[in-house]
Amino acid sequence: MAKSNKRRPAPEKPVKTRKCVFCAKKDQAIDYKDTALLRTYISERGKIRARRVTGNCVQHQRDIALAVKNAREVALLPFTSSAR
């Protein structure tokens, strides 16, 4: 016998769209040597923040991820957090 579904649907929250910072400012470039910029896209645990958290578009999120990985390879950024 099938269960009856008496749950109310959750009220829809308004979707807040963020504009990509790099699309808005065309002159701002993503470079692996700019660690101050890249640290804003890394969590305190050393993980790259998700696109839904940062609000970047697909292409710029890929560019940030690649720049963070390159900066880690040349020891400008840590692979993991230093605090335990």
Curated annotation (Swiss-Prot):
PROSITE patterns given in the database record: RIBOSOMAL_S18
GO cellular component assignments: cytosolic small ribosomal subunit
Pfam families xref list: Ribosomal_S18
Domain of life according to the entry: Bacteria
Keyword Transmembrane: no
UniProt keyword terms in alphabetical order: Ribonucleoprotein, Ribosomal protein, RNA-binding, rRNA-binding
GO biological process, one term: translation
GO molecular function: small ribosomal subunit rRNA binding; structural constituent of ribosome
InterPro entries with a match to the protein in the record: Ribosomal_bS18, Ribosomal_bS18_CS, Ribosomal_bS18_sf
Purpose of the protein: Binds as a heterodimer with protein bS6 to the central domain of the 16S rRNA, where it helps stabilize the platform of the 30S subunit.
Binding partners and assembly: Part of the 30S ribosomal subunit. Forms a tight heterodimer with protein bS6.
Cited PANTHER family: 30S RIBOSOMAL PROTEIN S18 (PTHR13479), SMALL RIBOSOMAL SUBUNIT PROTEIN BS18A (PTHR13479:SF62)
Similarity field: Belongs to the bacterial ribosomal protein bS18 family.
Protein name, UniProt field: Small ribosomal subunit protein bS18A
Species of the source: Mycobacterium marinum (strain ATCC BAA-535 / M)
